[in-house]
Amino acid sequence: MSSGKIAQVVGPVVDVMFASGDKLPEINNALIVYKDSDKKQKIVLEVALELGDGMVRTIAMESTDGLTRGLEVLDTGRAISVPVGKETLGRVFNVLGETIDLEEPFAEDVDRQPIHKKAPSFDELSTSSEILETGIKVIDLLAPYLKGGKVGLFGGAGVGKTVLIQELIHNIAQEHGGISVFTGVGERTREGNDLYWEMKESGVIEKTAMVFGQMNEPPGARMRVALTGLTIAEYFRDVESQDVLLFIDNIFRFTQAGSEVSALLGRMPSAVGYQPTLATEMGQLQERITSTQKGSVTSIQAIYVPADDYTDPAPATAFAHLDSTTNLERKLTQMGIYPAVDPLASSSRALSPEIVGEEHYAVATEVQRVLQRYRELQDIIAILGMDELSDEEKTLVGRARRIQFFLSQNFNVAEQFTGLPGSYVPVAETVRGFKEILEGKYDHLPEDAFRSVGPIEDVIKKAEKMGF
């Protein structure tokens, strides 16, 4: 094990000098430095650059407070390694695989794997054409998720990405019954804490591993924590041949941390100040999140859209890797429609008659056509009013508004805020409900009866209470 000495510390960047005869550590190797003589407080550094003349530049995974020039640094000879396997279930980790819950820490001999790996080769991959039912009407009807697929939840600040991902955990993890891995990347610690206790109460935690590198962590930890969660998921897929659910909240923070690290390493910034290696870093992460012939990884990733600008390089780079996109729209939150999923901007590779069936496909495309026509007519309505529309257009607008409201529903995880119980709607019920609205079966019911309900039967009950 070769050793060097700290030459300089600039925030989370630490330069380490190795003696001229010593072997330099490889890129991505983990180095250890002890802050105190008792060797109780250690900091892990990851090699990022070799500067020449025995000097390497590293990124710290923890705060560098207390580090001084001249402290001894040890090369572990391998990348950061984290615990994997059944022992990880029900536990909460940081980027280094250290437990941060109140339970006993792991034994030294627990099975560990490095966080840096190659993506599976082309001949190992497998694809699926089976739909993953979420119980959320707008998703199941218009942008269905594939088992073993990759899903992105796009949205600006405060439009409901985390609530939607928590509802998906509630619905899918409980129904799925398999193994889930939740990775919190640069998000609020409070949300992670709430999620942990909710999962503990519901019992889902027994089949879930949680990894957190939150907003208060150094950029190195936020950049690598997604790889830690992914390594745990990969083990279940490859070694235990499981079907794994991988939740990541938020992929944008991974890019943001990469941008901070890139600037600290002295690289020239690229478009909008992002790192020049943005596409490479995103590709290396996303290509590992895939399904192989041994098992599947279904990943659901929240992706923050800065200033609601979808052309920003961070969300635009993530788009290319996804099977389904669920776009959250601020205008819908202003109308009180939750989840605020844009039915026309969201898309899915799975929405084809071969995968979802002829009836589902026909209903979904007709719903999109009606909503698109309503959007085109809104300018006329705003300027001239409803009276200028033909009878056929008036009927279409009425149905479009009912569809728009019926695409909303109450969430189980939001019950504490709304006071209303959440609903899980099977796909068959969703398709039947929208088909009947399109046929004009409920044209006589008030539009408000369609707002925030579950299946179509709830609309009828709500209308009866309103006196219709």
Swiss-Prot record:
The superkingdom of the source organism is Bacteria
| One GO CC term, this protein | plasma membrane
List, alphabetically, the CDD domains matched: ATP-synt_F1_beta_C, ATP-synt_F1_beta_N, F1-ATPase_beta_CD
GO MF terms held by the record: ATP binding; ATP hydrolysis activity; proton-transporting ATP synthase activity, rotational mechanism
The membrane-spanning stretches of this chain are: none
User: EC number(s) on record?
Assistant: 7.1.2.2
Q: What is its main location?
A: membrane
Location in or out of the cell: Cell membrane
Topology with respect to the bilayer = Peripheral membrane protein
* Key words, A-Z: ATP synthesis, ATP-binding, Cell membrane, CF(1), Hydrogen ion transport, Ion transport, Membrane, Nucleotide-binding, Translocase, Transport
Q: Which InterPro entries match?
A: AAA+_ATPase (IPR003593), ATP-synt_VA_C (IPR055190), ATP_synth_F1_bsu (IPR005722), ATPase_a/bsu_AS (IPR020003), ATPase_alpha/beta_chains (IPR050053), ATPase_F1/V1/A1_a/bsu_N (IPR004100), ATPase_F1/V1/A1_a/bsu_N_sf (IPR036121), ATPase_F1/V1/A1_a/bsu_nucl-bd (IPR000194)
- Describe the task this protein carries out: Produces ATP from ADP in the presence of a proton gradient across the membrane. The catalytic sites are hosted primarily by the beta subunits.
Sorted alphabetically, which PANTHER family does this protein's record hold?
A: ATP SYNTHASE, ATP SYNTHASE SUBUNIT BETA, MITOCHONDRIAL
Question: Which family is it part of?
Answer: Belongs to the ATPase alpha/beta chains family.
Assembly behavior: F-type ATPases have 2 components, CF(1) - the catalytic core - and CF(0) - the membrane proton channel. CF(1) has five subunits: alpha(3), beta(3), gamma(1), delta(1), epsilon(1). CF(0) has three main subunits: a(1), b(2) and c(9-12). The alpha and beta chains form an alternating ring which encloses part of the gamma chain. CF(1) is attached to CF(0) by a central stalk formed by the gamma and epsilon chains, while a peripheral stalk is formed by the delta and b chains.
Entry protein name:
ATP synthase subunit beta
Q: What is the lineage of its organism?
A: Bacteria, Bacillati, Bacillota, Bacilli, Lactobacillales
